[in-house]
Amino acid sequence: MVDQQQAEQIRSGSGFIAALDQSGGSTPKALALYGVGKDAYGSESEMFDLIHQMRARIAQSPAFTGDRVLGAILFEMTMDRMIDGKPSATYLWQDRRVVPFLKVDKGLEDIADGVRLMKPMPDLPALLERANAAGIFGTKMRSVIDAASPTGIAANVAQQFEIARTILAHDLIPIIEPEVTISITDKAEAEKLLLEELTKHLDALPADTQVMLKLTLPETANHYKPLVDHPAVMRVVALSGGYSRDEANARLSRNSGVIASFSRALTEGLSADQSDAAFNAQIASTIDSIHAASVAG
């Protein structure tokens, strides 16, 4: 059963969703921005220990609570670890009132027909069982759109909804994330096609079924407003997608009903060697700015 208290917080809460789900591929970059170079770890497991310390430090900072941070997206290894002596998802909800989500995709295929589809996920049912046992509320999976290709975008969205049905069958709420690359010249056209495909699939969902959408901030403000208002959509969240935090916040504030789900923009300005006071002050300032942009639209 979907937790109704958590569902209500995600559906109507005033705040944003923190993305703490850097995977193996993006972890070295995230650590480097945090001031931890490759010379600080000698193995992948040491690298993951360090990134978990960073995530735990963020989750335990005083400003990181459900008042402004409605939910947090975790990497599988984070779900399996502890924060302050409790399993991560339990800690987030019980101690911080932050709704836990799990990143479930296994990365991207090579580009074909202007898009990058998700790699196969043969272990997904087992992972979803573990997520349920851990108290996870929903999932997130990312694919990418690199061109305004009608057939490519149709295939991309179809794959997302096909896997979403498996996730829904496990009583979890899927965050569907077909990211549009911000640097492409035909971004506005790709977004037009994406809106059409998403609407088509949302219309086909059974009654009383809801999903979430995580989308690149569009070229035209309120382009995705029909999705914000769609009965099959619990919430629309935006990724920062390579925009600076200021640019992402500015774009976000022009899109009514859309809230943030930022990763890099959340950790911008944090450093491993900051004192707790400086670290917590930086996190509080960042959370304030992303929260303000999320509620401005």
For each feature predicted by the language model, list its residue ranges:
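Eukaryote-skewed repeat-based solenoidal scaffolds used as protein-protein interaction platforms
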Residues: 139-213
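Alpha/beta catalytic barrel-like cores
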Residues: 1-137, 145-150, 197-297
